[in-house]
Amino acid sequence: PQMLSANERLKNNFNILYNQIRQYPAYYFKVASNVPTYSDICQFFSVMYQGFQIVNHSGDVFIHACRENPQSKGDFVGDKFHISIAREQVPLAFQILSGLLFSEDSPIDKWKITDMNRVSQQSRVGIGAQFTLYVKSDQECSQYSALLLHKIRQFIMCLESNLLRSKIAP
């Protein structure tokens, strides 16, 4: 039998997953305290912070953060979220989101942010998609459980509502 892709499995099981997800209560994420500022992470080369390895090397326009002990043990199959922020608001947006990005409850084990000091204003990432959140499955065969899908959805909604509440422009 032919193996279905993760996307095909999600489509085929949409109604089942949707009904399972609806049964979960709202999820509240513990916000990390004493998080570095955007200016701090732009100056780091490599540092461990709250279980995340932060790397900012000169050959890249991105600052990468990767959880040392990932929560999701599945494979990365290309699923990601981009959050685009007006260039001049990236430092403030990072300040607003960093407590969640570094949260021990975050379902995101790996993310990156553009180092705006290293990128051309006219480049794709200089204009938008400054945050990239990488999502990994939590089951075999790159499948997502209903619980993880719920947690990811709640996390993204929390990030968005924090940005909206702070009047951060896309």
Curated annotation (Swiss-Prot):
**Gene Ontology MF term list:** lyase activity
What are the GO cellular component annotations? extracellular region
Q: What is its EC number?
A: 4.2.3.-
**Keywords on record:** Lyase, Plasmid, Secreted, Virulence
Active site positions, chain numbering: 82, 112
Q: What is its main location?
A: secreted
Q: Where in the cell is it found?
A: Secreted
Cited InterPro entries = OspF/SpvC (IPR003519), OspF/SpvC_sf (IPR038498)
Family, similarity comment: Belongs to the phosphothreonine lyase family.
Query: What is its biological role?
Result: Catalyzes the removal of the phosphate group from the phosphothreonine in the mitogen-activated protein kinases such as MAPK2/ERK2, MAPK3/ERK1, MAPK8 and MAPK14 in an irreversible reaction, thus preventing the downstream phosphorylation of histone H3. This epigenetic modification results in inhibition of the transcription of a specific subset of pro-inflammatory genes, and ultimately to a reduced immune response against the invading pathogen. The diminished immune response enhances the bacterium's ability to disseminate and multiply within the host.
* NCBIfam families assigned to the protein according to its UniProt record, in alphabetical order: PRK15245.1
**Protein name as annotated:** Phosphothreonine lyase OspF
